[in-house]
Amino acid sequence: MGLAGKAAAETGADAVALPEIPKNLRYMKAVNIASARFGLDFTMETDGSDASYPVNFDPVQPREYKRISVQAKLPGAFNAYNIMAAITAVSSVTGKSFEELAALVPQVTPIKGRMTVIDKGQPFELIVDYAHTPSSFETIFPPVRKRCSGRMFCVFGSGGERDLTKRPLQGEIAARFCDTVVLADEDPRGEDPVELLKMIAVGAEKAGLKMNENLFIIHERQKAIREVFKMAQKGDIVLLLGKSHENSIIYKDYTMPYDEISEAVNALAEMGYKD
């Protein structure tokens, strides 16, 4: 989702109706999904070799299924479905087989700020992602929680002067999956930063977190990141959500240059974790 998509999600803009889904699409299913710190392995089960599909097919007749192994440098089980969609789209345009395209997936380089793993030798796992809506939280948290052997921490906020109704939902969803939630500035714009974050905290408290025990409001994002890093230990996973690839934090009277990945790397360096 780009900036336009993020703005639409934040403002609650009306959705645009998608065209009707064709009835002769390929059957595809991801099985044996194994998501690890730096990547993803799964098997793509499909009823054909490419995206082409007979116009006149008999749904009663049994179909033969292929099983294709896929490996990617993209953590997060949900990326299995993104990869299958991409393979199908490219196959439909180029005519290449699913097997040919699956073999190319390991060469795909992750986009900056999309499930970006930062490893400077610190004992905990650190992930930076763009997730900033309730639906994206529901997507990103479950697979990470499933493979987390320790505690999960997350740092996030919400866009100011945007959809207010999503804020408590963000807090509630994060609290269901994370052991500790730290609320920090995203883009408060003209709103009071702390009051904005308190609206998110309402949902987190509803889900069982307690303020200043496992729920914290630290509106200065740089400070919030450093406080979370101090808490995290071996086996824990820290998620920095919402800013991702963006290069600033917007306040009422000024815009502050900001790079989430650089900030995280600097914070780790201050703790002695460097290349």
What are these model-derived regions, one by one?
Residues R26-K29, F38, R221:
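Short beta-strand or tight-loop elements
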